Amino acid sequence: MDSLKKFKTTKLTSQDLNDFKIKLHAKYIEMLEANNNFFKFKEAEKQGKISKEELVEYKNKSIKAKKAFKAICQDKSFSENLKNITKIYNSTTRKNSSVILEQAKEELIEAKNLKREARDSVKDHGRGAQLTKLDKVAIKVENLKFKYAPDFPYALNDVSFEINDGEYVAVIGHNGSGKSTLSKMLIGVLSAQEGHVSIYGNVVTQDNLDQARKFLGIVFQNPDNQFIGSSVEADIAFGLENKRVNPKEMQKIIYDSAKKVGMENFLDKEPLNLSGGQKQRVAIASALALNPDILIFDEATSMLDPKGNREIKEIMVELRDKMKKTIISITHDMDEILNADKVIVMNGGRMVKIGKPEEVLKEKEFLRSIKLEIPFLSLVEEALGNEGIKVKHSQNMDELVKQLCK
């Protein structure tokens, strides 16, 4: 049947439904923010802090946002999609083959399901939207530029790179190099003024930011700022509750996440009474509970003592090797780059080097010129080489000692 063939080329799909949910959720958030701003500035106008004209401006923004949300809620595309296939199905007679009849029936069922889900998503404000993995490039940064103010220098200037799924990448640089700004870009705290960030092939926009963040887990420098519960268990549970995880599954998820970082026996302990390394383990467990594909460590070892520092670095390697997570570590700790698959060197807002650790460490004079210390292990390997003792690149001192013993 020609009409059925034509329908198959123009019909709406589950991807269209997901795109609808993303737009719906984005418009809902915009409406809430505009409405909250209006009521906040309404009070400010009463106190004489802003003029009536300014208040009218906020009121108009609120009205506009409500209309935009209402318009997308009244979208008829899924109803039209069902209407079209219903006509085709009803016009299909017994003269057609059983194959054609079955195909038309399948299309009708799919269209009904799409319409029902679209209707339900309106009630749920599009919260069920998800992004799918379109490729195996975990993070792709293209021509990224950012200034904190028009007359400021670029904090990021034409930065481009790719991080593949399952890679451990260290982003290194001194203070002011641009690595912290890059970190904020990756997690969506800042928006690019030029260029863009893609996660698994999805260009990140304000509309799909919430969905893109589901791929990410973040571990910050100071875990104390993340703790809100009276126990380790409560802190891990907090993130799950926010993501509307089934309560029946929550206990197992909490235990499994804690066990992955060796904290399963500390679930009843108060986080603030733990050591620095243990606190970071709790922060990692909280991130792992949501099962992200990508874990971003933002100066996660900089406030730890040597023991805690070493423990967290070992966990980061395990996350890559055993759990197949993509690891991005924003750091100024040059020793950490020895564990990485790839190193990105930032300076003056630009990416000045990218490559394997051993490739980057060959440029010792350049690294020193941009105020980066050479890892002690690398200096030892260099000294051995100068004495005619050739060794392979080692990730830690234990590996180097084993090579020397052989």
Swiss-Prot record:
It is a peripheral membrane protein. It is found in: Cell membrane. One of its GO terms (cellular component) is ATP-binding cassette (ABC) transporter complex. The keyword Lipid metabolism does not apply. Belongs to the ABC transporter superfamily. Energy-coupling factor EcfA family. Forms a stable energy-coupling factor (ECF) transporter complex composed of 2 membrane-embedded substrate-binding proteins (S component), 2 ATP-binding proteins (A component) and 2 transmembrane proteins (T component). This is Energy-coupling factor transporter ATP-binding protein EcfA1. The gene is ecfA1.
